Amino acid sequence: MKNKKLAFESLRTVLAVAISLVIALVTILLVSDVPGVALKAFLFGPLDSMRHFGNVLEMMIPLIFTGLAVGIMFQADQFNLGAEGAFFMGAVVSSFVAILWPMPAFIHPVVTILIGGLTGAVFCGIPALLKVKWGASELVSSLMFNYIAFFFGLYLINYFLRDPNAGAMVSYLLPATAKLPYIIPNTRVHFGLIIALLAVAAMYFFNYRTRWGYKNRLTGFNSLFAEYAGIKTAAVVISAQLIGGFIAGAGGSIELLGLYRRFSWTAQLPGYGWSGVIVAILARRNPAYIPLAAFFLAYLRIGADLMSRQSDVQNEIVAIIQGVMIVLIAAAGFLEKAQYKMVFRDATKDLADTGNKIQEVEG
């Protein structure tokens, strides 16, 4: 029954994605004067060159980190949306470490990423403590802290790291010793991709092969039952958000060291935390599916960007796809009747099998 339920949930997700894509394609056909060009760029543009495919992989890296971070917190039934702020603050603090603390080339990025991760853990840990100590909603407090993080980060960059010779509010150049190397020729795909995949494997192991993972999932499923079972749910709630924050903060540090010459996110929050929510929902909070969901979302965005350059359709079409997907996946009534029929059919079959076994024993 459990396997069938998982299969049904996967079917719901696939159908939601398919329906949203169909709606987007129909919209393109209706609004574009050159629908053939638009559709070709959208669907196949990311595959027409190594550079474009590399763009997909580049965008996939931060989405994996924020998707993992959000997924771990969601599994504990904690709707902490602080991954955005943790990602941003991880990058801000990493800028200080990279620029102000000279180190050997191999050690420099490792230390910088670890400190960025710890920064993210502290950031997401604050709403967790507020939730446990005073019952404050982690959803509301984490949303507010994202904006606090943005303006506090801008203050730090502006007053301590701003390059006066640059034409905008950006930091000094990051030293070469702190940068992550590129791993695919003719692209900007960096070593962060390998780190991201290792993080996925680690979180899958911890989530499904350790006692902590069992406690985390049980607390998310039913916190009262978890307490009756002897689990300290307060500790689980805090630890899930600390780990999620660490992953998001490390992701911000890796994104900075892999793709940027200096810290330059001064116009607005980078948005990867919000995208991580979409990735986590698509992956059903399962770490094993996070890379696939991140790749799918990155592919859509690069395809839409190429479409906007080569045709008369703007890349905001991705917002339509994302919105429809989230609504259908989150809607409890989507395919509800089909699920009831499946449960009823399986229950009837189980009862019939049980009755046959009883008759055989009595006979």
What positions do the PLM features span?
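Transmembrane alpha-helical segments in multi-pass inner-membrane proteins
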Residues: 242-248, 252-254, 258-323
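Transmembrane helix-bundle core of multi-pass membrane transporters
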Residues: 138, 142-209, 262, 317, ...
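Helix-loop-helix "hairpin" substructures at the membrane interface of multi-pass membrane proteins
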Residues: 185-262, 287-288, 292
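Interfacial/capping segments of alpha-helical transmembrane domains
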Residues: 25-46, 160-172
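Single transmembrane alpha-helix segments in multi-pass membrane proteins
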Residues: 27-31, 37, 44-101, 113, ...
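Cytosolic-side transmembrane-helix boundaries in multi-pass membrane proteins
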Residues: 1-19, 29, 201, 221, ...
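Short loop segments and helix-boundary regions at transmembrane helix junctions
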Residues: 2-11, 74-82, 104-106, 110-168, ...
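Hydrophobic core segments of alpha-helical transmembrane domains in multi-pass membrane transport
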Residues: 13-29, 63-70, 91-97, 117-122, ...
